[in-house]
Amino acid sequence: MDLKGKKVLLVGLAKTGISTIKHLDKLGASIIVNDIKDENKLRNILDELKSINDIKYILGHHPEDVDDIDMVVVSPGVPLDLPFILKLKNSGKYIIGEVELAFKLSNNPIFIGITGTNGKTTTTSLVGEIFSRAKRDTYVVGNIGNPVIDTIETSSEESVLVTELSSFQLESIDEFRPKVSAILNITEDHLNRHHTMEKYIEAKANIFMNQTVEDFCVLNYDDEIVKSLADKCNAKVIYFSRTKKVNGGVYLENNDIIIDIDDKIKFLNKDDVSLPGGHNLENCMAAIAIAYVCKIDLEVIKDVLMTFKGVEHRQEFVRNLDNVIYVNDSKGTNPDSTIKAIQSYDRPIILIAGGMDKGSNFDELLETAKSYVKSLVLLGETASNIENCAKNKGFNDIHIVKDMEEAVKTSYEISKSGDIVLLSPACASWDMYESFEVRGKDFKDNVNNLK
């Protein structure tokens, strides 16, 4: 892709946007940057981009007339149904995201693409660790926080790019083709962005739309939505399941993880897996399938599964104070993720939940919570919505708080020896925090300040 002298409109000045601008500049593109935030809110970012000469900014509003551009690159947080984006699309402008741009500019590394409503980051990190320990030139990139485009100068055909992909990123691909794709699960999420469940599923399925019979697609057999996508996939499908025996896949049999892709192999007892919970067992089986089809040594895979400590903000142990365990699951940004979190523990749970409203339904979460959760501590935009739903389910011990400091303090005061205080909000963080990472850090800081 030759971008020298081309006019490129970049929409969205987040982390991927900054990296994209720097690479577009190196390639000689003429850059127009648009962000809905104004100059004052973007001051630090603008300072970082001072060295770039051929750049124009349209800030605080979306552009009205940019007909003379050659290409549009959208950051993941930018909806593709914005009026000016639709106008550009209808006029025939080429619109892609950072992942697609990086794919086109790359030196043909091996892409592994991993998506799903939940478990993406853990599985991506797990696969990255497996390939790293196998001495492969490995990059862990994508939605996990490392822009894919930052690898284009250092990666080669021998490199492996383990890429976490959100539905937002998958909306804006065109020719992106991973050697191995994986869809871990699909449950209701981001309907404020995609509007319908069908559109959300369609975005997730984009991960395999360019794959051929020479590629592999790893799918969760236990997830009916995911399983139904197999008929649309041209790649060789490898299933994983913890409830059924699957031919040509990875499954659980008498507490043993079985690999049955070429020959049947009794691989590892599930109790030897270091990560807790049934959902993490599924993540591990997906990682096994990915690594196996890439011909990683089985002993390396086994060693990683037995020692991997997990990822920050994903059911992360914070502290044991007076025999009360504090757990940070700030990445639990939808009800299904929080259901999986509370089902991982056999102690009474004080659940801290609430955040930005994404249009989620909390009925199933609170129905499940009746068997696990003794108290609810609620904050953020959705606090009253969750409270009303909880009362309808018979919850009585509900506490509405104004911020994380009060949430932790209240949880501490009502806790008893043997309890778990679990931050798993079931909501996005953006009503109160810049990111789920900042929210998780605030929780940990407040927990560690308890005397």
From Swiss-Prot:
Main localization of the protein described in the UniProt heading: cytoplasm
What positions belong to coiled-coil segments? none
Provide the Gene Ontology terms for cellular component: cytoplasm
Among the GO molecular function terms of this UniProt record, one is:
UDP-N-acetylmuramoylalanine-D-glutamate ligase activity
The record's section on InterPro entries has:
Mur-like_cat_sf, Mur_ligase_C, Mur_ligase_C_dom_sf, Mur_ligase_cen, MurD
What is its EC class?
A: ligase
What pathway or pathways are given for this protein in its record? Cell wall biogenesis; peptidoglycan biosynthesis
| A single BP term in Gene Ontology | cell division
> What function is annotated for this protein?
Cell wall formation. Catalyzes the addition of glutamate to the nucleotide precursor UDP-N-acetylmuramoyl-L-alanine (UMA).
Please give the name of this protein.
UDP-N-acetylmuramoylalanine--D-glutamate ligase
Source organism of the structure: Clostridioides difficile (strain 630)
**Organism lineage string:** Bacteria, Bacillati, Bacillota, Clostridia, Peptostreptococcales
